[in-house]
């Protein structure tokens, strides 16, 4: 094993990278409340893993979506556990994100020179809320259907472009298959990709600038 490690070390300087990751200074004022962002990240990773597992059984059609969710809950091996963890972790992610935002605001972590870190965090908060809206509709039950109808109907109040935005969100003039397809694509591909990109930016800036000092 040492020869294999030495081969990679010679080319990639693994030890230097590991030292840089593990040797960052942690200010003495840091407490458990500074872990809220990391807990949010952990919840996101759980969401990715459990969500990926459910894509093997979920069918994003208005005629089969609800039945496929029932199959996951009643027949698929450990399907009930995977979906339950997905739901619990989703709620935990939203809660931890809200608490993290409050912690950063109350401790002044948004001030110079960390304005861009705050901006990426706000974007991540919006993406997290979007996960909730799109995921809520996927079982395509009565609650999901009417939630989608209400949410996608909100932009209709915007002058001039309102009706166009509604049709863009729904895929047609009414809620149906096109709407479910759009929400499924957003929930399983677009939002996770954007979240991963902004999380990378967010953590890179934290690594560069360090943790903000006490008030």
From Swiss-Prot:
Keyword Nucleotidyltransferase: no
Locations listed in the record: Plastid, Chloroplast thylakoid membrane
UniProt GO cellular component terms: chloroplast thylakoid membrane; membrane
Disulphide linkage map: none
Residues at which heme c binds: 35
Function as written in the Swiss-Prot or TrEMBL entry: Component of the cytochrome b6-f complex, which mediates electron transfer between photosystem II (PSII) and photosystem I (PSI), cyclic electron flow around PSI, and state transitions.
Family: Belongs to the cytochrome b family. PetB subfamily.
Identification of the protein by name: Cytochrome b6
Source organism of the structure: Glycine max
């Amino acid at each position: 094993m040492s020869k294999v490690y030495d081969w990679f070390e010679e080319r990639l300087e693994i030890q230097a990278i590991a030292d840089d990751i593990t040797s960052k200074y942690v200010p003495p004022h840091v407490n458990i409340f500074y872990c809220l962002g990391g807990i949010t990240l952990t919840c996101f990773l759980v969401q990715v893993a459990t969500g990926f597992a459910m894509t093997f059984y979920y069918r994003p059609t208005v005629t089969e979506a609800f039945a496929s969710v029932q199959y996951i809950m009643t027949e698929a091996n450990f399907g009930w556990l995977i979906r339950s963890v997905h739901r619990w972790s989703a709620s935990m992610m939203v809660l931890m994100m809200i608490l993290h935002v409050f912690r950063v605001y109350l401790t002044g972590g948004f001030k110079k020179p960390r304005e861009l870190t705050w901006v990426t965090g706000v974007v991540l908060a919006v993406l997290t809320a979007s996960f909730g809206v799109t995921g809520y509709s996927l079982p395509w039950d009565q609650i999901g259907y009417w939630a989608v109808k209400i949410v996608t109907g909100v932009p209709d109040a915007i002058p001039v472009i309102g009706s166009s935005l509604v049709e863009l969100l729904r895929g047609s003039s009414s809620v149906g298959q096109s709407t479910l397809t759009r929400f499924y694509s957003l929930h399983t591909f677009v939002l996770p990709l954007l979240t991963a990109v902004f999380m990378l930016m967010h953590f890179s800036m934290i690594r560069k600038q360090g943790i903000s000092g006490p008030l």
